[in-house]
Amino acid sequence: MDYSNKTVIVTGASNGIGQGVAVGFAEKGASVVLADLDEAAGVEAAASLQEKGWQAIFIKTDVRQESDIQQLMEKAAQSFGSIDILINNAGKAKFTPLHELEVEEWDDLLNTNLRSVFLCTKAASKYMKENEAGGAIINLASTRAMMSEPNSEAYAASKGGIVALTHALAASLSQERITVNAISPGWIETGDYARLRTEDHLQHFSRRVGRPQDIARACLYLTAEENDFVTGINLIIDGGMTRKMIYEE
């Protein structure tokens, strides 16, 4: 896969999965725009790519603000000439007991995780539809869109909304040659992988916990031009956990 003529925007790219995805595209030759609210970490992440000779810039962005998103798209297009791929990764996770969950917290989480996907896609697709090859959009959902634990109402609603929004967008943008897919990660360790316990790994069918690179490789597959027959799906990457029986032996 050659992405040397592609401009990729990754939101929430200062660390974790987003940073891993940014690295994955940069390695394949893409020009990468890292967007995040954390300016210090974002500048550092972009610099680490630039030091390797890769094309990368950081643009401070609050995905809750439509004006920030419009500015992100304008600067990205001005810097690299086009917008070809959007990775909607920005999000937050907070688990508050139901009877303590205030509407302000609910709104903030849904605005960050779900509304941002709508706003970023709406803004980016205006540029993508001008491309001869169209474009590709990936929305990061979660396995918590399909399964839950206590106190996850706001987070689950936001991620479930992303899955539904994804196939709606795939339908709406199909005439503009833009594919839209979701990825639902399971346990992706973004901290010290070496500190994980043996039982952490063995509870997965894959016999290991996931890494950001697992998500990056999926993004590369779903955004490759030759894979334009894949659109509207939710790709679950969880080492088999959502297919595992929960009953103890």
Question: Where are the regions that the model predicts?
Answer:
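Alpha-helical segment proximal to the catalytic Tyr-Lys
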Residues: 126, 171-175, 228
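Active-site helix of classical SDR
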Residues: 121, 158, 166
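Conserved glycine-rich cofactor-binding loop
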Residues: 14-16
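Short, small/polar-rich loop/turn modules that mediate ligand/substrate recognition or access, typified
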Residues: 87, 174, 179, 230-232
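Substrate-binding pocket helix/loop in short-chain dehydrogenase/reductase
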Residues: 97-98, 105-110, 200-201
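Residue(s) in the substrate-gating loop at a strand-loop-helix junction
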Residues: 142
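Short C-terminal tail/terminal secondary-structure segment
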Residues: 147, 220, 231-249
